[in-house]
Amino acid sequence: ELGYEYRHGEKISPGSSTSERAKYAETILKGRLEAALRRLNSDLPELAIDEAVRRVANYAGTSLIESNREMYNWIRDGIPVDIEIDGQMQRRKAQVVHWTDAIQNDWLVVNQYTVKGKKTDRPDMVVFLNGLPIAIIELKNPADETADVSKAFNQIKNYQTEIGQLFEPS
């Protein structure tokens, strides 16, 4: 047991009774992100947590590389938020990941995760860390003689173009 929760993509899709996102174009599971930020940053006020969730959920870089770099920095170092202390605005960092105790994080694996971008695609598996997609796994049928690693690699490269928003935090 590695501590990952498993869900089928349909179960968390828009319109499902257990939906975790409002639209197929959304790739960040905001409820999980918010819960993790609250758990990991109990010293920050509600408004700071709300600001951190908004910054991540609404971030739009000028390129996939820029977006990925900024999200990586936020995951590694924390999301900058402004809080008021003694009448003064101060910048703090809302930590996204518990780096010393992995079990304190929310790990989720979703199979058949539908995402709508330039096209609609459905990666075989997506791994989420505290609501952020951090890994995309493409599986191939070992009984299919034409299936190989290069086909899986090319499929993931196509995903970068077609559903690039899935790669911003990963």
Predicted regions and their residues:
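An alpha-helical interface "stripe"
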Residues: 1-170
